[in-house]
Amino acid sequence: MSWQTYVDDHLMCDIEGHEGHRLTAAAIVGHDGSVWAQSATFPQFKPEEMNGIMTDFNEPGHLAPTGLHLGGTKYMVIQGEAGAVIRGKKGSGGITIKKTGQALVFGIYEEPVTPGQCNMVVEGLGDYLLEQGL
């Protein structure tokens, strides 16, 4: 299965039990910042933004004072799981990033999708990839 298939079929799909509700954007990005696959709507990000995200996974709390930036959008960092999940909020939407052994799984959402639904979709795929040794 291609990485694009994971994005299209497992991240940008209808949320279970909520037909028509789906993430706004999604991607799978290597730890080095290389894009493995992304939705057409995923923002163009700067290398320093990806570096900041990777630093926060290695040094939890790094992004808390400045916020998480992706594609020029600033998200307020909210509760996550140190070294495993970063969550951010901006207005009625937000972002979830799950770290696997080799990649970062990104999901960006806006209402009516809820933070919990985004977490479920992104972390579900991330956990699956971890189980596969990825």
Swiss-Prot record:
> What is the protein's major site of localization?
cytoplasm
User: Would the keyword Cytoplasm be found if you checked this record's keyword annotation?
Assistant: yes
Compartments it resides in: Cytoplasm, Cytoskeleton
Pfam families the UniProt entry points to = Profilin (PF00235)
One GO location term (cellular component): cytoskeleton
A GO molecular function term, named singly, is: actin monomer binding
Q: Is the keyword Cell cycle assigned to this protein?
A: no
Q: Which cysteines are joined by disulfide bonds?
A: 13-118
Q: Which residues carry this modification: Phosphothreonine?
A: 114
Keyword entries, A-Z: Actin-binding, Allergen, Cytoplasm, Cytoskeleton, Disulfide bond, Phosphoprotein
CDD domains for this protein: PROF
What positions does the record give for the motif labelled Involved in PIP2 interaction? Answer: 84-100
Q: What Gene3D superfamilies has UniProt attached to this entry?
A: Dynein light chain 2a, cytoplasmic
Beyond the main fields, what else does the record say? The variability of the residues taking part of IgE-binding epitopes might be responsible of the difference in cross-reactivity among olive pollen cultivars, and between distantly related pollen species, leading to a variable range of allergy reactions among atopic patients.
What protein family does this chain belong to?
Belongs to the profilin family.
Report the function annotation for this chain: Binds to actin and affects the structure of the cytoskeleton. At high concentrations, profilin prevents the polymerization of actin, whereas it enhances it at low concentrations.
Protein name as it appears in the record: Profilin-2
Species this chain originates from: Olea europaea (Common olive)
